[in-house]
């Protein structure tokens, strides 16, 4: 009987400990995720109008925000345009950024000459503030690149960030460079956990670097790679590819994404309300 009571006491005590342990994270999830997003959901159905007589804002419930978005020809055209740019940016990051990140991580994993310096160089953009990097990059594209092209007897009609034909490519080049820090660090750390016996056995069997990378390293790293592949889909709707850092609130149709459109509209609405 005592053993049964003691076991029941320990069970109840463990249950209260578990409840106390889970209360804080569940409360944080409820307040900072469910409540915040529920409020955003309600705001989507609210209409804010300034009363010219009382000079006060009047609020009403409506579905006009959605009906205008999908019936207004200008809004549909804007949505298509920004979605196209977002898909292009996502495709570039997926098809170019991901393979390059894996190759760079493999270079560091094999401890080839300059691997540590290479790792520092790729991770540096994650340490320095974005506005500082953008300022340096703008000076480089505005002044250094034209001088280099002059030596090669190539002239530009405008700077790389000003010309419509070069603006998107220049912005994406910057985004590719600054995206390697976190991904390369995680890829290389995952590769470092690969059993040395597996690599040594493959080398004894005559596997070359190409085969080792694709048939040993990639499968062993796929758990980390899959996380980036899945979460990267959200970037289609949220990534603004540093539009604000480069162009502030100046709208550039060839680089504006869905993420920047949402940010642009939000700031515009705040400005209208504050006025």
Specify the residue positions occupied by each region the protein language model found.
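Short, Lys/Arg-rich, polar N-terminal cytosolic tail immediately upstream
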Residues: 1-12
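A structural signal for multi-pass alpha-helical bundles of membrane permease subunits
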Residues: 10-275
């Amino acid at each position: 009987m005592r053993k049964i009571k003691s076991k029941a006491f320990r069970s109840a005590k463990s249950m209260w400990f578990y409840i106390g342990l889970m209360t804080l994270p569940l409360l944080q999830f409820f307040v900072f995720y469910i409540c915040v997003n529920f409020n955003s959901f309600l705001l989507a159905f609210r209409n804010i109008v300034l009363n010219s007589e009382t000079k006060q804002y009047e609020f009403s419930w409506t579905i006009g925000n959605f009906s205008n978005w999908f019936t207004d020809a200008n809004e549909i055209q804007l949505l298509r345009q920004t979605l196209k740019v977002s898909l292009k940016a996502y495709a570039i990051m997926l098809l170019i950024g991901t393979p390059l990140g894996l190759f760079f991580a493999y270079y560091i994993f094999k401890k080839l000459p300059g691997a540590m310096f290479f790792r520092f160089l790729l991770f540096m953009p994650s340490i320095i503030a974005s506005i500082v990097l953008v300022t340096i990059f703008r000076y480089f594209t505005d002044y250094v690149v034209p001088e280099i092209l002059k030596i090669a007897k190539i002239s530009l009609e405008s700077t790389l960030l000003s010309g419509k034909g070069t603006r998107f490519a220049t912005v994406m080049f910057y985004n590719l460079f600054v995206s390697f820090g976190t991904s390369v660090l995680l890829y290389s750390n995952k590769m470092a956990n690969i059993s040395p016996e597996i690599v040594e056995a493959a080398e004894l069997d005559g596997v070359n670097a190409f085969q080792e990378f694709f048939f040993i390293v990639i499968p062993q790293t796929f758990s980390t790679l899959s996380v980036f592949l899945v979460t990267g889909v959200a970037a289609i709707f949220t990534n603004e590819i540093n539009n604000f850092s480069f162009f502030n609130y100046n709208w550039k149709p060839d680089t504006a994404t869905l993420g920047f459109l949402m940010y642009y509209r939000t700031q515009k609405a705040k400005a209208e309300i504050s006025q």
